C-alpha cells in the first residue's frame, strides 16, 4: 500500500538541508545519510548520496528516472550468495 495522495512525499529535513547547502557550493561532495525512507526529489538530480545499508554507505548517483522512488531501493541490505550446488552427482 502506497502513501496517500493527500500527503506530500516524505523527505527527512536533515537530508533536504544537506542537499540545499550543497547547491550553494560549487564543489559537489558525497552526501552521507541513514535515511533510506526519504523520497528522491527533482532537486537531488546530479548529486551522489551515500545511503547506509546496515554495514557501509553505498554511493548512489541520482538520475532523472529515480525521482519518486525511495533512497533505500538503490542500496540493497541483503547479500545473495546463491543456492548450494546440486549434490545429486556426489550422492551416487
From Swiss-Prot:
Signal peptide location: none
One Pfam assignment: Ribosomal_S19
Gene Ontology MF: a single term: rRNA binding
Key words, A-Z: Ribonucleoprotein, Ribosomal protein, RNA-binding, rRNA-binding
A GO biological-process term: ribosomal small subunit assembly
NCBIfam families: rpsS_bact (TIGR01050)
Protein family according to the UniProt entry: Belongs to the universal ribosomal protein uS19 family.
Function in brief: Protein S19 forms a complex with S13 that binds strongly to the 16S ribosomal RNA.
Protein's name according to its UniProt entry: Small ribosomal subunit protein uS19
Biological source species: Streptococcus pyogenes serotype M49 (strain NZ131)
Amino acid at each position: 500500500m502506497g502513501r496517500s495522495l493527500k500527503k506530500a512525499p516524505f523527505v527527512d529535513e536533515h537530508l533536504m538541508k544537506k542537499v540545499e547547502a550543497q547547491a550553494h557550493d560549487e564543489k559537489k561532495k558525497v552526501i552521507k545519510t541513514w535515511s533510506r525512507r526519504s523520497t528522491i526529489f527533482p532537486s537531488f538530480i546530479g548529486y551522489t548520496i551515500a545511503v547506509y545499508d546496515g554495514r557501509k554507505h553505498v554511493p548512489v548517483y541520482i538520475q532523472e528516472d529515480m525521482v519518486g522512488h525511495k533512497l533505500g531501493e538503490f542500496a540493497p541490505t541483503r547479500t545473495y550468495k546463491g543456492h548450494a550446488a546440486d549434490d545429486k552427482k556426489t550422492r551416487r
